[in-house]
UniProtKB/Swiss-Prot annotation:
The gene is ANKRD36BP1. Pfam families: CCDC144C. It comes from the Eukaryota. Keywords: Coiled coil. Residues 15-112 form a coiled coil. The keyword Cytoplasm does not apply. This is Putative ankyrin repeat domain-containing protein 26-like 1. The lineage of its organism: Eukaryota, Metazoa, Chordata, Craniata, Vertebrata.
């Protein structure tokens, strides 16, 4: 082999090496870009999932708020109803105690009157 052929092969080999290094850098850049794109897509998918989850939670929260409000209204009505019943029963109890006291007084008067007549 001649010097010229050897120089040509070295030059050709050097060009191939430079070309391969350039292609390697391009592929590494492409891989980095694709990884970033994959990462971005995964984040977008997660974001959509989280947004759906948030909407579901918002709806459940609204439903619970409505149920809580309805339960509060029912409790208020129930308390008002039982308060009315308690007031009515208290009034009736007061009236019956008064009647009982009058009956006791009448009985005592009758007993005294009977003792007065018998004596």
């Amino acid at each position: 082999m001649g010097t010229r052929t050897l120089q040509f092969e070295i030059s050709d080999s050097h060009e191939k090496e430079e070309d391969l290094l350039h292609k390697n850098h391009l592929m590494q850049d492409e891989i980095a870009r694709l990884r970033l794109e994959i990462h971005t897509i995964k984040n977008q998918i997660l974001e959509k999932k989280y947004l759906k989850d948030i909407e579901i939670i918002k709806r459940k929260h609204e439903d619970l708020q409505k149920a809580l409000k309805q339960n509060g209204e029912k409790s208020t009505k129930t308390i008002a109803h039982y308060s009315g019943q308690l007031t009515a029963l208290t009034d009736e109890n007061t009236m019956l105690r008064s009647k009982l006291e009058k009956e006791k007084q009448s009985r005592q008067r009758l007993t005294k009157w009977n003792h007065t007549i018998v004596d």
